[in-house]
From Swiss-Prot:
Family: Belongs to the cytochrome P450 family.
Cellular compartment(s): Mitochondrion inner membrane
Protein name: Cytochrome P450 11B1, mitochondrial
Organism whose genome encodes this protein: Rattus norvegicus
Gene name tied to this protein: Cyp11b1
Presence of keyword Iron: yes
Functional summary from the UniProt entry: A cytochrome P450 monooxygenase involved in the biosynthesis of adrenal corticoids. Catalyzes a variety of reactions that are essential for many species, including detoxification, defense, and the formation of endogenous chemicals like steroid hormones. Steroid 11beta, 18- and 19-hydroxylase with preferred regioselectivity at 11beta, then 18, and lastly 19. Catalyzes the hydroxylation of 11-deoxycortisol and 11-deoxycorticosterone (21-hydroxyprogesterone) at 11beta position, yielding cortisol or corticosterone, respectively, but cannot produce aldosterone.
GO MF terms held by the record: corticosterone 18-monooxygenase activity; heme binding; iron ion binding; steroid 11-beta-monooxygenase activity; steroid binding
Membrane topology qualifier: Peripheral membrane protein
Amino acid sequence: MALRVTADVWLARPWQCLHRTRALGTTAKVAPKTLKPFEAIPQYSRNKWLKMIQILREQGQENLHLEMHQAFQELGPIFRHSAGGAQIVSVMLPEDAEKLHQVESILPHRMPLEPWVAHRELRGLRRGVFLLNGADWRFNRLQLNPNMLSPKAIQSFVPFVDVVARDFVENLKKRMLENVHGSMSINIQSNMFNYTMEASHFVISGERLGLTGHDLKPESVTFTHALHSMFKSTTQLMFLPKSLTRWTSTRVWKEHFDSWDIISEYVTKCIKNVYRELAEGRQQSWSVISEMVAQSTLSMDAIHANSMELIAGSVDTTAISLVMTLFELARNPDVQQALRQESLAAEASIVANPQKAMSDLPLLRAALKETLRLYPVGSFVERIVHSDLVLQNYHVPAGTFVIIYLYSMGRNPAVFPRPERYMPQRWLERKRSFQHLAFGFGVRQCLGRRLAEVEMLLLLHHMLKTFQVETLRQEDMQMVFRFLLMPSSSPFLTFRPVS
């Protein structure tokens, strides 16, 4: 039985003027009988030239989530605007996400990430499932699903993640006990990045990087620096047309391409290691790459492309979610204690079978959903619709680009009563259809979803048994949009042994 939390929790107010946030109802009003035309959708207007200047000056759009949240407050649960000659419709209610899912084809289409595509085209490399659309996307995705999402795959990679999670906690415990105070205060974000990088890389390539405290390889440092640089430069380039940034941001483009080149070279080496083991007849350890090679359904180029994207997409997203969960647990000690009791009660079954963490920690799973409600790392889900549909009684024609803003959905009092409160138990009280979309939906949902869930559940389970997590900071973290939604600075957390 899930442990329930009844104590007061700290208010999470990661946006301005929460007490004036308007509840944008879902189905309270009877829709008018006459269908409204697309042109009647409220329009969000902004001066595109001033916006470009702002993006150039700020090297990104750090307040995008706040700007869109304010637009919903002013215009209602649906609005439209134009960008690059295309019409974009923005929504934020679960019912509209469900309607998008209902009309989704077997080939869901989304906009490619231009800086990543530019690198692939310049270097003559193939795209992976993150960047592909159409039949090529479907073929690649069907080959990868069994290695990432199936029960058999989860059973295969859980032991890999559990080893890394235990190593990480043991190393942190050792550092804590070496401190004369018997506790340790650290900037947790870099530590979470190292953990998720180590775990994801181990699952995908079958090799350890040494980021959790031992056997650190020089090439691992170069590789992780390249990942950081790639994400930073992506943010600086993604909001402006390449025709402009090729002149205004030549240094950033060079950094972006150089970073991807390092990542590409590193992944090539990992794939060659797998082929070498096969050629030498050595015992093959399980990994996502070795499974792709063994299946022989994807070309070497396709394996390389998908491996690059899997590694790039599995690190920061999970690390940020772990950081924000630990921060909320630190300032909500009663929630933390309830989770600790759940972990201790489930410890025997998880020791016998680490995969039990997926089923025996319902409150911890709910806490992760609550974190992603307040801090959706991927702050929106987007689709180019393949057929006409009706959203909020407006006609939306096929070919329209529709964006679901998760940041605003998670803060809508009509969807989540008392949205400012960190309340994991809300996810255990009733089914919430299309309200947990942090990993997307449908056949194009996040390919690394199960890996991310396992990494978060196992690490938090081992940490809660071992450490009391505290913080002196009770005010909210300022969140910024840098390709991903992340804290503007890392929270400083204190770890003490559990008494």
